[in-house]
Amino acid sequence: MLQVSVIGTGSWGTALANVLSENQHDVLMWGKTQTTVNEINTHHTNAKYLKDTQLHHALKATSNIQQAVLHAKIIIIAVPTKAIRSVMQQINEVANEKKVFIHVSKGIEPTTFKRISEMITEEMDPEKFQGVGVLSGPSHAEELALKHPTTVAVASDDKQIRQIAQDIFMNSYFRIYTNDDLIGVEIGGALKNIIALAAGITDGLGYGDNAKAALMTRGLAEITRLGTKMGADPLTFLGLAGIGDLIVTCTSVHSRNWKCGNMLGKGASLDEALAQMGMVVEGVRTTQAANEMAQAFGVEMPITQSLYKLLFEGLDVNEGVKNLMNREKTNE
C-alpha cells in the first residue's frame, strides 16, 4: 500500500482516485468545494461529476491543500489547465520533501505555449520536486468508474516515474502502457480536443460519417505536424495518446468537447454552449493556444485556424466548412 494524493475532485480525478483506492492504496483527494468534499467523505459519491457511481469506502477527501500535500509523496494533478499554476504554487508553499507528480490534464498554456509538465516544473522549487509524468489516452471517467476495460499510456522522462504510475494504477480493468515521449503524449492529449470540438460541430450540422472521418484524419495530420515541430516522436500520435484518444473524444457522447461542438453546430453561441455545459471544455482554450503556435512555428493547421475564427472571431459554421472544402488543391 502506498499513500497517494489526488488534487482535484472533478470526474477524471475522482475516477482515478477510486481506482487507486480499489487498488488498496491510501488515497486522499483535495477539492476546493466543501460540499463535494463532504459528499465524498459521508456518502462516498460525487454526483455532480460521476452520477450514480458508488466510490470506494476508504476514499477520503479534504479541502485543506496542506493536508493533501503532506499526506503523500506521489501526487496526481487533476485540475484544468488554467488552474495548474495557481494550484502548483499552493503545493510548493506547503511541500516539505521531493514530490512525484503525475498529471492528467490535457491542455497548453496560451501565449507561453507551455505544456502541463513544463508549468508544473516551473512552479516547484527543485528541492521539492522529484519529477513529473502524464497519464493520457482514450478514457472516459464514466466508463472507468464502471470498471469498463480502459487502456492509457503514461509518459515521463524518468523511467522510475513511468514505473510508479504503471504499478499504482494497473488492475484487471485499467491497463497502463509506458512511453518515454513526454512531449508527444502531452501534445496528443491536448490537441485532440480541438478536433473533437470540430467533430461535434459537423454532427450538429447533420453531416455524416464521411465528413467526420475526413475531419479526424486531417486533424491527426495537423496534430502530428505541430507535435513533431515541438520535438515529439511522430509515432506517438499513432498510439493511445494520439489516434486512440482522438477516436474516443470525437465519437462519444461522453466527450465534453464533442458536446460543446455539437451545440455550436446546432446554432448556439460559444457562451451559451459553455454555460449549458457547466464544466471545463479544454478544447476552447487549447484552440487559442494552438492557433498562436501554428503561426509562430509556421505549421499549416487549417482546421485549427478555422475553428479559432469560429470560436473567437464570429465566423459562421457553414462558412467555415465551405472555406475548408474550397482550399487550394494540394497533395495529401
Swiss-Prot record:
Q: Which residues form the active site?
A: K192
Keyword Metal-binding recorded? no
In what pathway does it function? Membrane lipid metabolism; glycerophospholipid metabolism
Q: Which reaction does it catalyse?
A: sn-glycerol 3-phosphate + NAD(+) = dihydroxyacetone phosphate + NADH + H(+); sn-glycerol 3-phosphate + NADP(+) = dihydroxyacetone phosphate + NADPH + H(+)
Subcellular compartments = Cytoplasm
Q: Which Pfam families match?
A: NAD_Gly3P_dh_C, NAD_Gly3P_dh_N
Q: Which residues bind NADPH?
A: S11, W12, K32, K106, A141, R256, V280, E282
Q: What is this protein called?
A: Glycerol-3-phosphate dehydrogenase [NAD(P)+]
- What organism, scientifically named, is this protein from? Macrococcus caseolyticus (strain JCSC5402)
